[in-house]
């Protein structure tokens, strides 16, 4: 079945297909204001009910093809540094479980691929993020994927290695899974003391965001510490990830592809 992306997106509320309209400019201004304020913008119910249902069906159908990985990582995705004190944030490692459904499970015409290929989508995201260098990730296994997390899974506190992420909530778990973040905690320096407070559960600067199916999120995660709280229940959490990079033709290195 081939999907028309215009039938999956709430274009009345989010007129990304009408860039010359006043409604589009108001939307763009609102998103950019949120990004400037907290590094996070959410377009609630960007997908309509039909779009959500189509995304869930595709994710469930492809879930058996998910690749799973388990490791321990710190917030910086770096190795341990024995020259630092044992309680230093760089030396705090946490279990990380990750499962993703590769992009080759979402062929042209599927709901997920239709949104990614919708001609107005990329220009809107680029304009919202105000990115001059903005290219689609060229990796055929990772340009648009679905992250899958199950009971006990989550994503510990970390900083992103890229400037921004573009994600779309597809299905929530029965419990847990809140998106927690500290905006711009290291915008002007590493700020290790405050990072340590977050890691130890002592910070009063943590914001909590409960994303719902159909929500599109733009997030500036390089300087904002964030995590996905552990999940519970039988229902898996699905989140679609649209991947963009700063150079054309980029694909994963062998190390990143494992």
Predicted ranges, named:
Residues 1-37:
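Fe(II)/2-oxoglutarate
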Residues 107-113, 122-216:
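Catalytic core of non-heme Fe(II) oxygenases with the double-stranded beta-helix
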